[in-house]
Structure formats: C-alpha cells, structure tokens
C-alpha cells in the first residue's frame, strides 16, 4: 500500500445528508498518511516479495509502456516504482507523496542516478498540479481486502486530471474475492472475550469493595464493546489453501481505466459457494484480492502480470487475507451450497474504514435449507 488522505468526516457534511462526507485533511493526515512516513513501514512493503516481484515484472516485461513516456506515480512512498519506471526508460516520472517520505524518495532517486528523470513532489494528489499530461499512472494503492484505506479515490482523481486518452494504468484491473473457510480463530477469539469479561467482573467487584461504587450497570456495554472487537471485527490472517473448504467467488471487478468513486464507495454482491470438503465446519468467510497489469485495449501489455493475495502454500503477502467470523458456525458437507448476500460501505466516522454485512444461508445437498443468518463485520 502506498500513501494518501484517513479521515473523520466533518459534521457539516453529515448534517447536510446525501452526498459523500467532506474529509478533514489535517485529521486525515494524522490518522493515515503519517503511518507511511516511517521507513520501518516502507521496509515492510519492500520486503513483500510477491508485491515486489509483481510490480517489477509488470514494469520491465512491458517496458514499451514506459520507454520515452511520462509516468505519474501516485503515493510514491520510498520511490521504488518511480525508480523502476525511470530504469525502464521513462522520459519523465512525477512521483507524488503526501508525507515527509518524499525526502527519502529524493535521496533514493539521487543514489540510483535517476534524479534527472524522477521529480518527487510532496503534496496531496488532489492538490498537485503537473506541467503536462502523462502516459502511464502507476500506483500501489491497494489496502486490506482491496478497498480499505480508500486510496483508489486519489488514483481516480489523478487519472481523470492527468492521464492521456490513450494512457495506461498500472495495475489496470482488480478483483475482490470471498471464500468459505475452516478456522480455529472463532474459538480463540471467544476465549479472549471470556478472559476480558472475567477481568471486567473482577474489576467490578474490586471497585465496589474498595471504593464503594457499583460499576455493574456498565457490564452490558463493556461486553458489547468487546464482542465487536473480538467477534465482529475482520481479522488479518495468512491462511493455508487447505483452510478454504469451497469454491471462491468474485464479488467485485474493477476496471481502473473507467471506475468511478461512486462505483467503489459501496460494494454489493450475491454469491453461491459450493462446499468441496466433507464433514467439516464453516467457521468464517475469507476475503482477498488480486490485481492485473494488462495495459489497455488500445495499448495492451506484452506480458500480463497478476498480483494475487489469495492463500498460498508458500506464504502470503503483507496484505494477508481478511477473516470474517460467522457466529454461529455451520456444519457442512461436500455438495452443500452457501449463499451469501454481501454489502460493504464506508464507515461514517472514517471514510477509510469499512462496515460490512453478511447474510448467509446453507442449502444442504439433501435439499434442506437452514434459516438465513445476518452478521455485521467491521474492517478497521
């Protein structure tokens, strides 16, 4: 993930109703951008071999898209994509970065002898003014489950303002996936919840015993708070492929050349996922994404490259997968079908976080249909 605007929505926008909330840029910077201004965070992404290999291959196997061209790197971070673009033959690279990481990007450009090509610009992509249109927009904008962080908004803004009509996007396409899985995470999180409640009950007893104040009236609220944290929040995990017990389904496809912010502000899908493993338990759904570097119809890639964050026997990426616990879990068998209705919207409190709702129902191979269950999950 590269860097760009997290933020609390202004009260005036909420009061007005209707359109998208206005973002407080200072709050956004404090909550989101600042994370990417640290080298340790950049190093985490630079050490992700799947990520690095995919972007490196996409650029150098398709050098014709870069040779002699003007490139815009949105959220350049350390500047690695800008440097590769220059090494692939770009005439000019504008590398936009909102944080002070911009200075490190300049240092790296100088150290790698591309400072005459790579111009690092510190500022918000929405505010930056370039002296010319660009042939290529490259960006590593993907967040957890693809759309967390909402950085793609800034890429869309850059595309609409600066990309030439025959320009290309790197990546050019993206997909979101959902799959049924087996996992012990639910038991682990339930145990954590009970430990937290046991600690709370001791606190209530001690507070009344030592200080004469009965806190028990807050027990219900405390439990609800912790149920949200332990059971209703998406869990980062690097799953093994054998934990996937059924057919994964695409729930969203994005064409980066044509997508609008309205199209990604809310995601809705209805999918049916056949179970492929007998006598097991559906404990959760897992979400991940992949992106593709295809160029465009008018200017296709010589070699298409895919970056996938699906469960992998060789280990995963820094994105991992997001696990959405289903409570209660369901006993399933091969031949059963899980039908899921899915909705994901941006949090009203922070447009970079996501609120999700899953309605799932089991259709057994015998013909029996279990009642639908609805659960809310928060991707924070």
Swiss-Prot record:
Q: Which Pfam families match?
A: PrmA, PRMT_C
Under InterPro entries, the record lists: Arg_MeTrfase, PRMT_dom, SAM-dependent_MTases_sf
Which residues are responsible for catalysis?
140, 149
What EC number(s) are associated with this protein in UniProt?
2.1.1.319
Q: Which reaction does it catalyse?
A: L-arginyl-[protein] + 2 S-adenosyl-L-methionine = N(omega),N(omega)-dimethyl-L-arginyl-[protein] + 2 S-adenosyl-L-homocysteine + 2 H(+)
Q: Where is the SAM-dependent MTase PRMT-type domain?
A: 26-357
Which residues does the record give as S-adenosyl-L-methionine binding sites?
42, 51, 75, 97, 126
Ranges for the region named Dimerization arm are: 187-227
CDD domains hit by this protein: AdoMet_MTases
Top-rank lineage group of the source organism: Eukaryota
Instruction: Offer an example of a GO molecular function term for this protein.
Output: histone arginine N-methyltransferase activity
Its BP terms in the Gene Ontology are: chromatin remodeling; methylation; regulation of DNA-templated transcription; vegetative to reproductive phase transition of meristem
Cellular component GO terms, alphabetical? nucleus
Which keywords does this chain's UniProt record carry?
Methyltransferase, S-adenosyl-L-methionine, Transferase
User: What is this protein's function per UniProt?
Assistant: Methylates (mono and asymmetric dimethylation) the guanidino nitrogens of arginyl residues in some proteins.
The record's note on quaternary structure and interaction partners says: Ring-like homodimer.
Q: Which family does it belong to?
A: Belongs to the class I-like SAM-binding methyltransferase superfamily. Protein arginine N-methyltransferase family.
Q: What is this protein called?
A: Protein arginine N-methyltransferase PRMT10
């Amino acid at each position: 993930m590269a860097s760009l605007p997290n933020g609390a929505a202004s009260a005036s926008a909420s009061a007005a109703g209707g359109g998208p909330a206005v973002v407080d840029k200072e709050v956004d910077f404090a909550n989101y951008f600042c994370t990417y201004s640290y080298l340790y965070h950049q190093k985490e992404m630079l050490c992700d071999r799947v990520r690095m290999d995919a972007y490196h291959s996409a650029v150098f196997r398709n050098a014709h898209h870069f040779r002699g061209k003007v490139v815009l790197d949105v959220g350049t971070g350390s500047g690695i994509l800008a440097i590769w673009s220059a090494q692939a033959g770009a005439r000019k690279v504008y590398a936009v970065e909102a944080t002070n990481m911009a200075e490190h990007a300049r240092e790296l450009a100088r150290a790698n002898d591309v400072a005459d090509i790579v111009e690092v610009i510190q500022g918000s992509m929405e505010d930056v003014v370039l002296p010319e249109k660009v042939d290529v927009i490259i960006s590593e904008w993907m967040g957890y489950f693809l759309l967390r962080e909402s950085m793609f908004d800034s890429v869309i803004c850059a595309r609409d303002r600066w990309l030439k009509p025959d320009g290309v996007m790197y990546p050019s396409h993206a997909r979101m996936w959902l799959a049924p899985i087996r996992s012990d995470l639910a038991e682990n999180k339930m145990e954590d919840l009970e430990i937290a409640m046991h600690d709370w009950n001791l606190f209530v007893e001690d507070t009344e015993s030592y200080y004469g104040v009965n806190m028990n009236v807050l027990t219900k609220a405390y439990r609800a708070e912790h149920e949200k944290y332990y059971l209703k929040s998406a869990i980062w995990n690097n799953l093994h492929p054998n934990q996937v017990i059924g057919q994964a389904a695409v729930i969203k496809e994005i064409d980066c050349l044509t997508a609008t912010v309205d199209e990604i502000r809310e995601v809705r899908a209805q999918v049916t996922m056949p179970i492929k493993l007998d006598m097991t338990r559906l404990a959760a759904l897992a979400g991940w994404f992949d992106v593709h570097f295809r160029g465009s119809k008018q200017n296709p890639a010589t070699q298409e490259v895919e970056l996938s964050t699906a469960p992998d026997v060789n280990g995963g990426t820094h994105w991992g997968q997001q696990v959405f616990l289903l409570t209660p879990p369901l006993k399933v068998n091969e031949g059963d079908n899980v039908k899921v209705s899915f909705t994901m919207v941006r949090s009203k409190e922070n447009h970079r976080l996501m609120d999700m709702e899953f309605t799932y129902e089991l259709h057994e191979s015998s013909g029996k249909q279990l009642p639908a269950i609805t659960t809310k999950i928060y991707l924070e």
